[in-house]
Amino acid sequence: MDVESKISLILRYPTEEVITVEELRELLQLGHQLNHYIGFEISGFIHIGTGIVSMSKVVDLQRAGVRTQILLADIHSWLNNKLGGDLDTIRKVAVTYYIEAFKKVIETLGGDPDATRFVLGSDLYHHNDEYWLLLMDITRHLTLSQVRHSLTILGRKMGESIPLAYLVYPPLQVADVFALGAHIPHGGVDQRRAHILARQVADKIRFYPLEVGGKRVKPVALHHKLLPALNISTKPSNKEELSEMKMSKSVPQSAIFIHDSPEEIRQKISKAYCPPRETEYNPVLELLHISAFREERKTPFIIKRPPQYGGDIEVWTYEEVERLYREGKIHPADLKNATAEALINILEPIYKYFQGPGAKLLQEMKNITITR
């Protein structure tokens, strides 16, 4: 695969931005093995924003010849008091439910689960003096203002009452980029600030310098779209506000989980925010895009409509759907029905896995979340 084809794969939906495309091109042109990483907190059930959206980019990167890595961020999760702040439980969930779920999603999306390296954060840090020297080195080159700016909206609003752990978190994220040798750190657009910090210190750190062919380089940040919560009631005014209105594990009706049954998916989508003719920040359209139009279609996609309203519509591209919806030629109810069936189809192998071989993992997770 030539460089431009690799770039097209990396840039395609659901990619939101790459910082910068030209630097990515330069790295690919050098012809050396590039490494990627994406990190996840260990908390509740995996929803499709974490599962389908994130893993679709992992699969794209695999196809582009990039070595992919998933960091199971147990220490970060503990700092953020996930799963009740029980570190043993966090670690158990990470190496069981999370790894197996991600592997199944990667396989379902056409990738190779064995080609992705899974790293538990505490394993990366254990008996690793150089990691802690790296972390201290990073803090030498960051100001309190920079770290505060990298926090979530909520964290920035807390002022002087903010837990110190929240301020430790961004430097840890930056250190992970270099400790994993990640030329392409990846996350949702809500991770942009942390990745910018990594780029700012890349030329200054002494430990774990990021190199390609002996040349020191800055990490090229890859950010994918965030799925709006199904139950939003208004359109977010900007991307940062969207990060506070994204699908959330802690609000079940805001999200579709990778193990949800067809009935649950239909029910959730039927109640989703989907204003007529509105195509921006429309969660139903975003779900249809990721489930039915990420790959070039070999057959038309059918949106069923009652005969009295013109009958079924055949479309080949997402752009067609968006245009027809904006023009009012697709009713929200018909869009929701078509989206639900498309999502049920793509999630079917994952749903069957959690009904069969993965049923024990799912039940263990349910037991854990009930007691937290």
Curated annotation (Swiss-Prot):
Catalyzed chemical reaction(s): tRNA(Tyr) + L-tyrosine + ATP = L-tyrosyl-tRNA(Tyr) + AMP + diphosphate + H(+)
Motif interval(s): 'KMSKS' region: 246-250
Enzyme Commission (EC) number: 6.1.1.1
Source species, domain of life: Archaea
Keyword Nuclease: no
Locations listed in the record: Cytoplasm
Pfam families xrefs: tRNA-synt_1b
InterPro entries: aa-tRNA-synth_Ic (IPR002305), Rossmann-like_a/b/a_fold (IPR014729), Tyr-tRNA-ligase_4 (IPR023678), Tyr-tRNA-ligase_arc/euk-type (IPR023617), Tyr-tRNA_synthase (IPR050489)
Primary location class: cytoplasm
Example GO molecular function: tyrosine-tRNA ligase activity
UniProt protein name: Tyrosine--tRNA ligase 1
Lineage: Archaea, Thermoproteota, Thermoprotei, Thermoproteales, Thermoproteaceae
GN (gene name): tyrS1
